[in-house]
Amino acid sequence: MKQELIERFTRYVKIDTQSNEESHTVPTTPGQIEFGKLLVEELKEIGLTEVTMDDNGYVMATLPANTDKDVPVIGFLAHLDTATDFTGKNVKPQIHENFDGNAITLNEELNVVLTPEQFPELPSYKGHTIITTDGTTLLGADDKAGLTEIMVAMNYLVHNPQIKHGKIRVAFTPDEEIGRGPAHFDVEAFGASFAYTMDGGPLGGLEYESFNAAGAKLTFNGTNTHPGTAKNKMRNATKLAMEFNGYLPVEEAPEYTEGYEGFYHLLSLNGDVEQSKAYYIIRDFDRENFEARKHNVENIVKQMQEKYGQDAVVLEMNDQYYNMLEKIEPVREIVDIAYEAMKSLNIEPNIHPIRGGTDGSQLSYMGLPTPNIFTGGENYHGKFEYVSVDVMEKAVQVIVEIARRFEEQA
């Protein structure tokens, strides 16, 4: 199993599937289509049925039941795309067997070193096989680790028919990283009673609470004149953007928050004197606090418009997803089964809120309750990203055990 995980994962991450926030196609990048087509062929090779890929790039497949019991249909999902935060082109995965727990030089030429000082969890992977980047790209373990685990688990169940299970549906979705994953997901066609996203992090992660999330795009319009004669004429759009940011609470940013604390995050700022554009994400677990944060942004914009003119600041703000806890609580047994599956495999479940979102956040509100399970990755979205193959193997075992337990309890 370990070799299959390594072979599939290292092959998958070499395919550039970064999504693109600026694109309006579905999926937003051709790499996701290419990857989806490959997975369709490999799902068929494994022996799954009803393998489809629709016009929007959503891949679905079925592992038929091998029991006569009336077992609910379970889904397992992962996403095709990788993050936009750092380059995902020309990924060169580096395999470190029997890791010694010490610093790893990822790139000697660029002096990129993965150290326990910067990443204290690193020594806990001593003895594991870990896969890192070469220091020039992200790895793409988010979410190609989860995707690989689903593929390997399905292959394992096909070749071990003594493990009884109900019908299992698999889906791989595009554009999760930019919040559009479930936008065109056909819940009815998928046909599962509930599902699990394999999109978590370290060993034991079991998550069924997510942020309420919104995105805010602000356009600041200035007036550019020669700086030598600019008095009472110039309006600097970049300074307007700085002023807006200054109104937000400094301590309510990602770098100062944890646990159940929400934040405002300036994701990007580009521009000049004439025009500047800022993109923020707004996050909070509590719905009332979430709404209050959005109102705060609107109020700041209103104040600035009163001060500088209506056209000085233009706000576009949209909700992205909501806390899935509300939809999962009524079917709590799907969390309990996953919890029991982990315990039976000597994995200590680590239940904590997702300081982010998964496809499950939106799918839960579309009628498909979907908690999230660990995959074994660390330091997502950057050059220090890595994954433990040993933990990936545990994730495969959890998928298999969840399927087995639902059949056993039917």
From Swiss-Prot:
Keyword Metal-binding: yes
Cysteines joined through disulfide linkages: none
Reactions it catalyzes: Release of the N-terminal residue from a tripeptide
Family matches, as InterPro entries: ArgE/DapE_CS (IPR001261), Bact_exopeptidase_dim_dom (IPR036264), Peptidase_M20 (IPR002933), Peptidase_M20_dimer (IPR011650), Peptidase_M20B (IPR010161)
Organism of provenance: Bacillus cereus (strain ATCC 10987 / NRS 248)
Binding-site positions, Zn(2+) 1: 79, 142, 199
Entries under Pfam families matching the protein: M20_dimer, Peptidase_M20
PANTHER family: PEPTIDASE T
Binding site for Zn(2+) 2: 142, 177, 381
EC number annotated for this UniProt entry: 3.4.11.4
Protein name, entry field: Peptidase T
Cofactor binding mode and count: Binds 2 Zn(2+) ions per subunit.
Locations listed in the record: Cytoplasm
PROSITE patterns (UniProt xref): ARGE_DAPE_CPG2_1, ARGE_DAPE_CPG2_2
Residues annotated as catalytic: 81, 176
Main location class: cytoplasm
BP GO terms, sorted: peptide catabolic process; proteolysis
GO cellular component: cytosol
EC top class named in words: hydrolase
